[in-house]
């Protein structure tokens, strides 16, 4: 009898856990899966094998085999694929820009290094144990089983693409301290927070005298910021290029500089840094931003961490994120960036703004992939944090203006408005499944214009000639955007 019961239990176990062996993938296999994903989840519906060029591959130091593949799309876009079926297929993707690993900022480089370490440990894990980790998503991609296109399920809150001042043609660090005849970069913490401040249009003005410190401990006296020195958000732009007016460059640099020195940046020519916990506290002390709540990923269940992040984004609040490594090297210091988007159909994919002139801004897989595995020495969740509730004070007209805007019906995808800033009119590309109303609001929440979007793929012209200079928010369906009138 005991033997019969044991046989039945063994049969049930084998039925419940199919022993499919996880395997590593060649570049061609990964490319084929990437094509199918891009065709059904992005604006790159017509992607073919000729469109995806292998631009970089990460290598497992133990086995020497590939661990991740980066494919750049010839029509602008990229996708990073895990090189094992034991992991989620998609590491990251963009359908509007390529990725040059030689130009990545340290924050993105750090994040990809951590993710790659996780992939390598899974590849090195005992083969019999690894079989239970086979990701079911691979089956749909390898058998070309996806239907339709889910590009309409993504929401991106921010259009800002600011930088630390390191890249050619950008001058976000015009006011940063000079050390040994070199102007210091603004730093990732200040850049992340400055982009959030620009998103909200707050603080309204600079206050008092502040000092900055150099990384060698030298205290640097900086210019006085008068109470009356209001920030002119109307002339700030989402991105600096060679044609950006000098007045806009100065104002954006002034905001980044003031944010930096008041949150405690330590400036140095090779890189400026600050402690995230202290910086967030100073946002409350100096700017009256509400006290943000910091969640360390390793202290809560992964589902809790991701739900807190998603809840923040669903309230249209860009989320400050940070991370660090536990030992040495270029990544030992902290890193900071902004998470400002998500996919409504995928609880793992989130849009990251790395504060590096738009380089690498894309959707990234934040899922923990059932890690850590018992017995493994690596935990992807360590040394990561998010800050929720970092919003302007309740008496600010900027606070929760996005949440106050009523939702419109219909599935809508809005493109980037152009020109932006504008003086007479703004063109707004869109795609919607049926007739939808686009509403435009001033920064204090007043509706100033509406426009009907007809079903299909088109663009609409918004007349802004009579609108006062300032920041305006538009909404259609669940999608937001922002433009500036001068």
Residue locations for each model-derived region?
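C-terminal outer-membrane/trafficking sorting elements
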Residues: 18-19, 407-418, 422-486
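Active-site-adjacent substructure of cysteine-protease-like catalytic cores
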Residues: 56-75, 286-353
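Exposed beta-strand-loop-beta-strand "reactive/processing" segments of non-cytosolic proteins
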Residues: 46-85, 94
């Amino acid at each position: 009898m005991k033997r019969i019961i044991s046989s039945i239990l063994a049969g049930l176990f084998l039925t419940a856990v199919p022993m499919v062996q996880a395997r590593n993938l060649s570049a061609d296999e990964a490319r084929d899966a990437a094509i199918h994903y891009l065709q059904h989840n992005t604006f790159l519906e017509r992607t073919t094998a000729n469109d995806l060029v292998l631009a970089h591959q990460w290598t497992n130091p133990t086995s020497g085999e590939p661990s991740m593949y980066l494919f750049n799309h010839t029509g602008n876009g990229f996708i990073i694929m895990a090189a094992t079926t034991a992991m989620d297929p998609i590491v990251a993707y963009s359908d509007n820009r390529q990725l040059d690993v030689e130009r990545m900022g340290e924050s993105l480089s750090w994040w990809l290094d951590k993710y790659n370490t996780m992939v390598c440990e899974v590849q090195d894990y005992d083969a019999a144990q690894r079989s239970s980790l086979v990701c079911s998503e691979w089956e749909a991609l390898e058998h070309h089983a996806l239907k339709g296109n889910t590009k309409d399920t993504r929401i991106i809150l921010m259009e800002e693409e600011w930088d630390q001042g390191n890249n050619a043609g950008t001058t976000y660090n015009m006011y940063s301290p000079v050390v040994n005849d070199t102007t210091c970069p603004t730093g990732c913490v200040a850049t992340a927070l400055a982009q959030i401040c620009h998103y909200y249009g707050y603080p309204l003005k600079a206050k008092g005298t502040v000092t900055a410190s150099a990384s060698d401990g030298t205290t640097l006296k900086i210019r006085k910021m008068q109470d009356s020195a209001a920030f002119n958000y109307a002339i700030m732009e989402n991105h600096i290029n060679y044609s950006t007016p000098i007045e806009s460059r100065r104002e954006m640099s002034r905001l980044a500089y003031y944010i930096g020195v008041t949150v405690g940046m330590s400036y140095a020519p090779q890189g400026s840094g600050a402690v995230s916990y202290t910086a967030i506290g100073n946002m409350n002390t100096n700017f009256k931003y509400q006290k943000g709540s910091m969640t360390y990923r390793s202290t809560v269940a992964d589902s809790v961490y991701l739900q807190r992040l998603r809840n923040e984004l669903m309230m249209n609040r860009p989320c400050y994120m940070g991370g660090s490594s536990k030992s040495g090297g270029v990544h030992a210091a902290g890193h900071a960036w902004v998470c400002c988007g998500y996919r409504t159909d995928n609880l793992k994919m989130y849009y990251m703004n790395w504060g590096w002139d738009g380089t690498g801004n894309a959707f990234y897989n934040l899922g923990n992939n059932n890690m850590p595995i018992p017995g493994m020495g690596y935990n992807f969740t360590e040394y990561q944090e998010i800050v929720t509730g970092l919003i302007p004070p309740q008496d600010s007209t900027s606070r929760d203006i996005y949440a106050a805007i009523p939702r419109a019906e219909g599935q809508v995808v809005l493109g980037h408005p152009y020109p932006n800033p504008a003086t007479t009119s703004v063109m707004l590309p869109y795609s919607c499944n049926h007739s939808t109303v686009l509403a435009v609001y001033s920064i204090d929440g007043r509706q100033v214009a509406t426009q009907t979007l007809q079903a299909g793929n088109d663009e609409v012209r918004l007349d802004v000639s009579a609108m006062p200079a300032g920041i305006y928010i538009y909404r259609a369906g669940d999608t937001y955007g922002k433009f500036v009138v001068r």
